[in-house]
C-alpha cells in the first residue's frame, strides 16, 4: 500500500512539474522615464524613426509608468530579445492615443528578427482585430475581424499559441482562432505599432503555455 501510494505521489509530482507555467510581467514602473526600458530592444520593420520610451501616465493600469511609442515608422516594434518562446501566451494592456493614418497596438511572438515574426493587433481607427505573419520584412494578412476598439481607452490584447493553433482575444472576447504554420519554433516576444500610431503599453506579460 505504501509503495503504491509513493508511486501515485511521484506520478502527480511529475505531472505538476510538466505543467508548471513560467510567467513574467513587465509594468515598467521601476524603469527610468524618457528612455527604453532595461532589457528591451526597439526597431522598425521597413522605414521610419520610432521612439520607444518609458513615460509617466496617471491613467496607467499599474501606475506610474507605461511604455510608449511616439515616433513613426512602417511597423515599429519593441521586444525582449532574451526570451525564447515557441508555445505559450503573450498579453498586454494598450491605449491608442493618436494617429491620423493608424491608431494601432499589437503584440509579437516567435520573433526571429525585425523581418520575421507573428503579430496580432487592434486598430482604433478601423475598429478591427487582425492577425499577420511577417516574413522577409513583408507583412502578410492572415485574418481580419471587426471589433470595437475605442481610442483613448485601455484595452487588453492576448494571444495564445501552441503549434499551429493561434487564438486572439481582445478585452476578454475571442475574435480569432485558427491554424497557421508560416512561422514555427521559438522566438522573442514584444509589442508593436504601425505608422504614426502613438500608443501606450502596460502590464506586458508572457508565459510558457496558454492558461
Task: Name each region found by the language model.
Residues 1-11:
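Bacterial N-terminal signal peptides that target proteins for export
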Residues 17-23:
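Boundary at the C-terminal end of the N-terminal hydrophobic targeting segment
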Residues 28, 90-92, 153-168:
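Short tryptophan-centered beta-strand motifs in secreted/extracellular beta-sheet-rich domains
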Residues 33, 69-135:
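Secretory/extracellular carbohydrate-interaction modules
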Residues 33-66, 73-74:
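Extracellular glycan-recognition surfaces and repeat-rich motifs
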Residues 135-156:
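Short, aromatic/His-centered strand-loop micro-motif at the edge of beta-sheets
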Residues 169-190:
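Short, solvent-exposed beta-strand-to-loop segments that form ligand-recognition rims
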Residues 183-211:
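Ligand-recognition surfaces built from glycine- and aromatic
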Amino acid at each position: 500500500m505504501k509503495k503504491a501510494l509513493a508511486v501515485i505521489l511521484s506520478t502527480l509530482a511529475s505531472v505538476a512539474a510538466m505543467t508548471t507555467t513560467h510567467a513574467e510581467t513587465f509594468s515598467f514602473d521601476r524603469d527610468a522615464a524618457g528612455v527604453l526600458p532595461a532589457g528591451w530592444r526597439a526597431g522598425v520593420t521597413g522605414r521610419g524613426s520610432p521612439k520607444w520610451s518609458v513615460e509617466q501616465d496617471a491613467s496607467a493600469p499599474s501606475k506610474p509608468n507605461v511604455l510608449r511609442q511616439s515616433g513613426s515608422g512602417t511597423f515599429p516594434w519593441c521586444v525582449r530579445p532574451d526570451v525564447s518562446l515557441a508555445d505559450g501566451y503573450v498579453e498586454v494592456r494598450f491605449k491608442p492615443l493618436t494617429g491620423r493614418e493608424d491608431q494601432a497596438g499589437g503584440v509579437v511572438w516567435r520573433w526571429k528578427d525585425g523581418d520575421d515574426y507573428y503579430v496580432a493587433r487592434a486598430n482604433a481607427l478601423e475598429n478591427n482585430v487582425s492577425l499577420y505573419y511577417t516574413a522577409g520584412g513583408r507583412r502578410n494578412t492572415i485574418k481580419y475581424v471587426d471589433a470595437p476598439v475605442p481610442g483613448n481607452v485601455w484595452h487588453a490584447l492576448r494571444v495564445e499559441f501552441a503549434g499551429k493553433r493561434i487564438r486572439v482575444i481582445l478585452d476578454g472576447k475571442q475574435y480569432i482562432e485558427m491554424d497557421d504554420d508560416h512561422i514555427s519554433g521559438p522566438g522573442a516576444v514584444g509589442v508593436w505599432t504601425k505608422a504614426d500610431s502613438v500608443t501606450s503599453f502596460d502590464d506586458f506579460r508572457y508565459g510558457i503555455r496558454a492558461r
